[in-house]
Amino acid sequence: DLLREFLGAPDDQIDCPTEAQRELFGPTRRRVPEMLDLKNPVLLGPVQNQEHHMNGVVARRDNFNEPILGFLEQCYDEFAQLTGRRYGLIQEYRTEDADTVFVSLGCAAENVEAACDYLREQRGAKVGSIHINVIRPFPEAAVINALRGKKNVIVLERTDEGMSGDNPLGRDIRTTLSKGQEASRYGGTLPSITLDQTPRIFRGSYGLGSRDFRPEHTLGAYEFAVGGTVRKDGKSAADGETYFTLG
């Protein structure tokens, strides 16, 4: 009943929320548009010339992609009203006074949060965690606001793209902070962050080949970032190294 109330029925008629949708569907549309009508079996887009394909890609970005984050935030608010459980584009854990913040996806965040509790209680370390709930579109404004003024950010990912400059999430974090620096110089819609407010980015890979990811791995990541340990090749954060593998 809760899911039915929150999601509605596929054939409900709802108001179109954007001008682009109103132009496409009219003032209202089916909650889940029918992609195939057996009574009118037509197909759109299997073959397009270069001009029309490019126009479609640009129109999709401007008219349909950009409003998505706002829709998601509205959905999180409605879900919180129904259940009392509030999610968001990102979830912050003990980040208010943290100088080192972990960033992760999925169930890894639970291990990271447990390690943050241990580091605070046993070592007095000011650490926190950010759990990214939405990866596309990437929540750039929320990430900039959450990381502004931190000393270190440790991005943990269950992958290793060895021939790329960064793994995917680390690349998104680095790009986001760079765009925030541009906003501080040139303005724009994103929140601004100065170079002095930008944390140093550390990047770690864990759990490759389904190897276990344990809280002690998070402790090791923290020790590397603050200069308390070195990699097996002897290199450390003091040498300018920011990548490591856990486990």
Q: Which functions belong to the PLM regions below?
A:
Residues 6, 13-17, 92-97, 145-147, ...:
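Solvent-exposed alpha-helices and their adjacent loops that cap or buttress functional pockets
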Residues 74, 78, 82, 114-129:
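Short helix-loop-beta junction
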Residues 89, 96-125, 138-145:
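Redox- and metal-dependent alpha/beta enzyme cores, enriched for Fe-S-associated oxidoreductases
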Residues 130-136, 203-207:
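Short beta->alpha junction loops
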Residues 154-247:
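Peripheral docking tails and interdomain loops at the edges
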